[in-house]
Amino acid sequence: MDRSGYFPVLDEDIPTKSELRLPLESKTSSRSRRWLHLVLVLQSVLIISLLASLHILGNRQPSNITCAKQLSPYSPYLEDGDLELEEFTELNHLMQPSPYRGQPTPEIEEAWVRLWRDYAHVSTRYGDDMLGFLNVFHQLHCLNLVRQYTYRDDYDYSNVTAFRAPQELVRGHIDHCIETIRKSIMCASDVTPVVFQLDDSRKSGFKSDFNMRRTCRNFDKIQDWAVANAVQGDFEKNMASSCTLSTPREKEKT
């Protein structure tokens, strides 16, 4: 064999195994880096989306109904009604005129009757024999009864069922109503600040300002809902009998 065309190969001219693997490993490493970058980008997008969602949820204002349900036991009104809040400046100085205050007249008595009379409610969810009413109307009934009791010597309330009972029961009814109003006030615990105003005409030099900002539930809507769900028939007539309008008592001639 002619060996003239051959020449010796030096050791450094022979590629090592690692050098033979280098192109393949380089491609694999490049692919891995691309996947790593993609994973990091997706992870960043996911974290940003999660933080944005938490921010939106954390700053979203709950509805009036949602808030009310946190502060009240079950009520059919909170399931069916539209709880609307009203913000206004209340006029309530010491001698503020009102259709509900002052010496009893047929007009004042009628105004009070309209506040609470048609409150009976039947819930068809539990069958036709489930009867009840919203507590606000019981509270108004109690306040009205205490008001009438303070004027019982000046006005003829003989047609009011509560006053036809024995005096012990009448007194018990009044005390029950006072307790009901006390508990209601303490339960609500209105924390609206009442500020003082300078008033040189007063000995103390100041007076309380009861004309304050208020945020209240829309009572008209609550009343409309109660009337729309009121029981009709004899029951309503029997309930209404306890608030029959009276007439001013005639003073005895001497």
From Swiss-Prot:
Transmembrane segment boundaries: 38-58
GO cellular component: membrane
Membrane topology: Single-pass membrane protein
EC number: 1.-.-.-
HXXHC 2 (motif): residue ranges: 173-177
Residue ranges annotated as motif HXXHC 1: 138-142
Pfam families: UstYa
Localization annotation: Membrane
GO biological process: mycotoxin biosynthetic process
Keywords: Glycoprotein, Membrane, Oxidoreductase, Transmembrane, Transmembrane helix, Virulence
Enzyme class: oxidoreductase
Superkingdom field: Eukaryota
UniProt cross-references to InterPro entries, sorted A to Z: UstYa-like
Pathway, per record: Mycotoxin biosynthesis
List of glycosylated residues: 64, 159
Coiled coil: none
GO molecular function ontology, one term from the record: oxidoreductase activity
Recorded family membership: Belongs to the ustYa family.
Comment on protein domains: The 2 HXXHC motifs are conserved in ustYa family proteins and might form active sites.
Function summary: UstYa family oxidase; part of the gene cluster that mediates the biosynthesis of the phomopsins, a group of hexapeptide mycotoxins which infects lupins and causes lupinosis disease in livestock. Within the pathway, phomYc' catalyzes the desaturation of the Ile moiety into 2,3-dehydroisoleucine (dIle). The pathway starts with the processing of the precursor phomA' by several endopeptidases including kexin proteases as well as the cluster-specific S41 family peptidase phomP1 and the oligopeptidase phomG' to produce 10 identical copies of the hexapeptide Tyr-Val-Ile-Pro-Ile-Asp.
Name this polypeptide is given: UstYa family oxidase phomYc'
Gene (name only): phomYc'
